[in-house]
């Protein structure tokens, strides 16, 4: 057995070590075990149940491989070095467990508390349902209540889920390759144990069995890779190094995605952002492969960042690997993208509360931050000289310059001419491929990931596929409704060792894919893939024409407020920081489920808002904790409000977990990068409104979310009154002028009793007198009186009526 296989089997034992808890809670029958000594020595029922699972589902692995899995049974009573490694990994991973004070037996019901229910000192009773992972409201969103309400039903729910888990694991019985076995089981564990608490009887049940098991697996792999003996595991001290926590940051992502001309950019933007998502995962996979580590050692990957656990003996490999990744990125993108790698060793003590928070701070502030100040610092002198010494091109020739990204035409490269309105657009081969990727995403039924050999030398990159192939992964977006052999959907299979298939459309038939892939080991992967693409992948001006009122497109950017603070300090309770690796992984995964899995559902008609926004919005990026969306201007604030309301429900109404956003508007010729910058500035204004942030900036004004529904209501009422109910159009302009006068006085620190007070009363009284519709007349008078009240009580309608009026003016403006 080679070292890599032994490392994978250690991870497999770690992944399975507590699977018996799942069976135990479901009252699943145990397999009859003939070895009476084993029954006696295993000691814990869940360990016995885990041993039973191995016997039932790992029969095709070799006898030697199954012996390496003995830690599943004996991690509480080790008999071998392999058992000791699982025991230590379990103990370190369980460092997250926070004792439950004063719990009575009837409170100890095994439901998982939402990761958000206890952040920042909040203490909400919110629990996840026991359901197979799906990106549906009924599955993802927590329910409020006391676990005792479900104490009579939980065993039936567990048994139902266990039966589905066993059925999904049946293919494991036919797998003899430990690498394929591990990856397959890893996916099934995600699907079925993401919602199950690792511990609950004497602990706060806020860490899932999935997160605890994968961290145990990752640590067991590190210990096996470092060849830690049983004696070492038993004798290890508090300051002994156990593993290395590595962070990778692909720098240059924002400029790569958004610094584009408007001409034709809409059709390439989604492809570019999705390429970055794929590239992050592919680079992380490359790092794991080169370090000889299994997928369980990837803590998180998304949005240009990844975290992984490596063995202590791998430290000397990290710098050369960082250099190699950056060399390949530079070959592909000429320095626009590069990898910044940083790491910190983790001692045994770092895994225990409260010390992990300090290790997390050390990784970012003392390692990553200085490294980011040395861009391309990982490159060797020769590689740096080659990059700096490359000719920059002649410049100035628009006929041979890409209209979208500005790249000059290379020798032998075919530029594609096209039209964007009245403007001629020339596209380089890479931008053509990004446009094709965006179009393929809109119609794909499956994402296929093929693990292939890493080329010794990276190839020149003229397509997104080649950029990924340089790291040993071939990716295809497949539409199984069309013959695969005709549309060349599947890349070359030569050298492919493993295929991962993700369903984009749940009901799509996978049989054509199975036939096309032949005998290549195939794994079904559950992964969120945020998809919100209007039919035909419209241009920006086409989106603008779908607006109500003025023809404008716009950009919406949103992200979670104070995310770094949430990770660093969010788990502090009673003067102790309870941040651990498992909690960090769980929080990251929960955010990913919302932004990548649930978010697209919010464009469909909602219970309290029947408007369908799918034809007006084009989601460019959603992942980690943020989103970037292009759309018809009038749909953007409506969608932003839906996101905020849904996020508040998803995060258990925790007032300390919020998000802010900014919206910019643009016409057809406005550059995308400028619209993106404007939206970013608006988002910054929203975050700067108050200490709590939790706001949206729109049309030049930041508004707290708790006031936004009233602003929207007033805006649409005003537009309707002037268009259909006989109110004079001067009403809107009058309100804009009143708000401007108030704002001028406010800046002079004289917000009360200014000229605006009597002007507003006089003019709005005259407007009301001219209106015949009774409801409109009463509405105008109500606004007048609310503004008048601001003389005596600061705030209220006067703060936001100007925004509502500007919004109404744009809604009412005739199409140009």
Regions found by a protein language model. Name each.
Residues 1-303, 309-816:
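Charged, helix-rich terminal subdomains or tails
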């Amino acid at each position: 057995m080679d070292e890599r296989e032994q490392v994978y089997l250690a991870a497999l034992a770690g992944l399975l070590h507590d699977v018996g808890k799942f069976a135990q809670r479901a009252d699943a029958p145990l397999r009859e075990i003939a070895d009476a000594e084993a029954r006696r020595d295993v000691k814990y029922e869940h360990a016995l149940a885990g041993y039973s699972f191995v016997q039932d589902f790992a029969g095709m692995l070799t006898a030697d491989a199954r012996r390496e899995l003995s830690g599943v049974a004996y991690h509480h009573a080790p008999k071998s070095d392999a058992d000791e490694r699982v025991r230590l990994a379990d103990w370190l991973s369980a460092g997250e467990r926070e004792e439950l004070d004063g719990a009575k037996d009837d409170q100890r019901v095994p439901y998982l508390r939402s990761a958000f229910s206890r952040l920042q000192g909040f203490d909400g009773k919110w629990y996840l349902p026991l359901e197979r992972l799906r990106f549906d409201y009924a599955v993802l969103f927590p329910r409020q209540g006391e676990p005792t309400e479900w104490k009579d039903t939980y065993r039936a729910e567990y048994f139902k889920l266990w039966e589905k888990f066993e059925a999904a694991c049946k293919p494991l019985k036919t797998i003899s390759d430990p690498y394929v076995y591990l990856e397959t089981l890893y996916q099934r564990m995600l699907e079925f144990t993401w919602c199950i608490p690792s511990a609950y009887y004497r602990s706060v049940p806020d860490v899932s069995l999935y997160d605890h098991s994968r961290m145990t697996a990752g640590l067991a792999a590190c210990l096996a890779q470092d060849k830690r003996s049983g004696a070492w595991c038993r004798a290890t001290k508090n300051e002994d190094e156990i593993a290395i926590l590595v962070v990778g940051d692909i720098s240059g992502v924002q400029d790569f995605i958004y610094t584009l001309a408007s001409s034709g950019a809409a059709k390439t933007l989604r492809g570019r952002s999705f390429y970055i998502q794929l590239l992050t995962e592919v680079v992380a996979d490359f790092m794991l492969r080169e370090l000889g580590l299994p997928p369980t050692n990837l803590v998180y990957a998304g949005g240009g960042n990844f975290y992984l656990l490596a063995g202590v003996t791998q430290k000397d490999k990290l710098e050369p690997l960082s250099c190699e990744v950056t060399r390949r990125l530079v070959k592909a993108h000429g320095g626009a993208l590069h990898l910044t790698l940083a790491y910190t060793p983790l001692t045994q003590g770092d895994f225990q509360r409260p010390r992990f928070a300090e290790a997390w701070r050390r990784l970012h502030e003392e390692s990553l931050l200085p490294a980011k100040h040395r861009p391309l610092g990982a490159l060797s002198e020769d590689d740096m000289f080659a990059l700096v010494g490359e000719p920059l091109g002649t410049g100035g020739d628009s006929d041979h310059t890409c209209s979208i990204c500005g790249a000059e035409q290379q020798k032998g490269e075919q530029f594609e001419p096209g039209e964007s309105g009245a403007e001629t657009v020339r596209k380089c081969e890479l931008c053509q491929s990004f446009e094709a990727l965006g179009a393929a995403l809109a119609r794909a039924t499956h994402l296929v990931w093929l693990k292939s050999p890493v080329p010794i030398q990276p190839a020149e990159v003229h397509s997104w596929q080649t950029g990924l192939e340089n790291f040993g992964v071939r990716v295809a977006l497949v539409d199984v409704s069309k013959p695969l052999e005709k549309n060349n959907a599947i890349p070359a299979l030569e050298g492919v060792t493993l295929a991962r298939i993700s369903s984009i459309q749940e009901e799509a038939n996978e049989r054509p894919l199975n036939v096309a892939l032949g005998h290549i080991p195939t794994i079904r992967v559950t992964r969120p893939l945020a998809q919100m693409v209007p039919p035909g992948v419209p241009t920006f001006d086409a989106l603008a024409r779908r607006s109500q009122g003025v023809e404008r497109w716009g950009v919406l950017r949103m992200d979670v407020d104070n995310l770094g603070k949430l990770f660093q300090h969010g788990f502090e309770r009673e003067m102790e920081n309870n941040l651990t690796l498992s909690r960090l992984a769980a929080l990251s995964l929960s955010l990913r489920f919302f932004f990548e899995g649930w978010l697209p559902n919010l464009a469909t008609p909602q219970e309290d808002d029947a408007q369908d926004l799918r034809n007006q919005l084009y989601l460019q990026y959603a992942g980690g904790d943020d989103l970037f969306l292009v759309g018809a201007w009038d749909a953007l604030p409506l969608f932003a409000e839906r996101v905020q309301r849904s996020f508040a429900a998803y995060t258990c109404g925790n007032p300390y977990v919020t998000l802010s956003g900014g919206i910019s508007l643009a016409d057809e010729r406005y550059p995308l990068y400028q619209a993106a910058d404007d939206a970013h500035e608006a988002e910054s204004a929203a975050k700067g409104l108050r200490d709590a942030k939790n706001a949206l900036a729109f049309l030049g004004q930041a508004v707290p979310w708790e006031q936004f529904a009233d602003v929207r209501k007033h805006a649409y009422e005003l537009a309707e009154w002037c268009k259909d109910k006989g109110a004079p159009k001067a009403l809107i302009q009058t309100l804009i002028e009143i708000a401007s006068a108030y704002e001028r006085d406010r800046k002079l620190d004289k917000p009360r009793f200014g000229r605006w007070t009597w002007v507003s009363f006089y003019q709005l009284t005259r407007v009301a007198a001219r209106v015949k519709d009774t409801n409109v007349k009463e509405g105008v008078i109500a606004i007048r009186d609310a503004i008048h009240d601001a003389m005596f009580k600061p705030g209220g309608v006067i703060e936001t009526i100007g925004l509502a009026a500007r919004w109404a003016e744009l809604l009412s403006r005739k199409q140009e």
